[in-house]
Amino acid sequence: MHIKEMARRLQITPRAIRFYEEKGLVTPKKADGSGYRQFTEEDVWRLQTVITLREVGMSIEDIRQLLRQLDEGEGGLLHYLELQLSFVYDRWVELSKVIHTTEAMIARVKRDGESDPASLFELAEASKRLRLARSNWVDRWNFNQLAADYDKMVTESREGFNPHERYEQVLDALVEKVAPQPGETGLDAGTGTGNLARRLRERGATICAFDQSPEMLKRCRQKNPGVEAKLGTFFAFPFLDSRFDFVATSYALHHLTDEQKVLALAECRRVLKPAGRLAIADLMFTDADHRAQHLEALRQSGQTDVIERIEYEYYADRSRLLAALEELGFQPEAEQLTTYVHLVFARLA
C-alpha cells in the first residue's frame, strides 16, 4: 500500500510516517521504477506499535532499541502486540506509584495542617529513586542469545564453581515448598525456558509466566503449550492485581540490584491474592558478613576468577530480602539448598 493509504489506516498524517521513517523505525520498500514507498502489513503493525509506545510516553530512542531486539528475534504480529502490552503494563504500574505518592502527600498535608516542603521533597525523591531503579535495568547477559543453550548450561555437571549446582533438585524443592494444588492459578516470574513452569503445571495448577526475553519465551511456550506466557519485566508484571494463589521464581532475581529486588517483591505482592504464597530459589548469601567471609576465603585460595563471576551478578543478601518481605506483609522463612542457592518461602499474613 502507498503512504496515503497507510496514513488513513493508522489515522495519522503522511508527515508523521515520514518522520518515523527518517528515525529508522520503519523501512518501507521502494517500488521499482517509480520510487514510491510500498508498505506491507508488517509495516502497519510495526508503526502501530511505535504509535502506541509514543502515546504512553516512550522515547524514540527507547522504541528504536526495543524494535531492534525484536528484529534480532522472532518478528510478526504477536511480538508487536506483546511489546505494546508489556510497555502499557509498565506505564500503568509507574502511574500507580505516582498516584500512591501523590495520595501520600495529600494525606500528609491534611494531617499536618500545612505544607512541609522537606517532607514532600522526601516523598518525591523516594518516588524518583524507584522510577530510576526500574528504568536503569539493562540486559547485559543477552538472554536472547543464551536461550538456545540455556538448558544445557544449567544442567551440565562441572568441576569447581557451579552456581547451578543440583539445578533439577532445586526446582523440585521449590515446587514442594509452594505446593501447587489443582484449581489454583500460579505465576512463574522470569520463567526463562519454562523449566519451573512445567513442574508447577504438572501438579495440576493453571500456570502463567512472563519473561523479558522473546527467545526464552519461545522455548517456554514450546515446552508448555498450556501456559499463558507473556512478555514482561520484574518491574511491571503483565498481569492484573490479586490474580494468583502463588508466585514462584527461580534463578532470576540475581540479575537485579538490591533496590530492584524490592520493586520485584512489591510486584509479587500486587498480583497475589490474600493469603497468597511466594517461593524464591536464587543465588544468595545469608548476610553481608557471610558474603565477605566467603569472598575472602576465595581470595585466600587464589580463586579470583570465581570472585569476578560472583561480583558480575547481584547475589541477594538474604537478611535484607526477608526484611523487605516482612515490610510488604509477608511471613517469610528461608533455608540454604546448595553453596549459593537459598530457598525463600513467604505467605501473606
Language-model region placement:
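Conserved class I S-adenosyl-L-methionine
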Residues: 132-179
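Core SAM-dependent methyltransferase catalytic element
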Residues: 327-349
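Class I SAM-dependent methyltransferase SAM/SAH-binding core
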Residues: 185-189, 193-236
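Short, charged amphipathic alpha-helical surface segments
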Residues: 65-127
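Basic helix-turn-helix/winged-helix DNA-binding cores
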Residues: 1-61
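A short glycine-rich, Lys/Arg-flanked "PGG" loop and its adjoining helix->strand segment in the class I
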Residues: 262-274
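A short acidic, Gly/Pro-enriched loop at the edge of an enzyme's catalytic core
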Residues: 235-247
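C-terminal alpha-helical "lid/dimerization" subdomain adjacent to the S-adenosyl-L-methionine
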Residues: 280-335
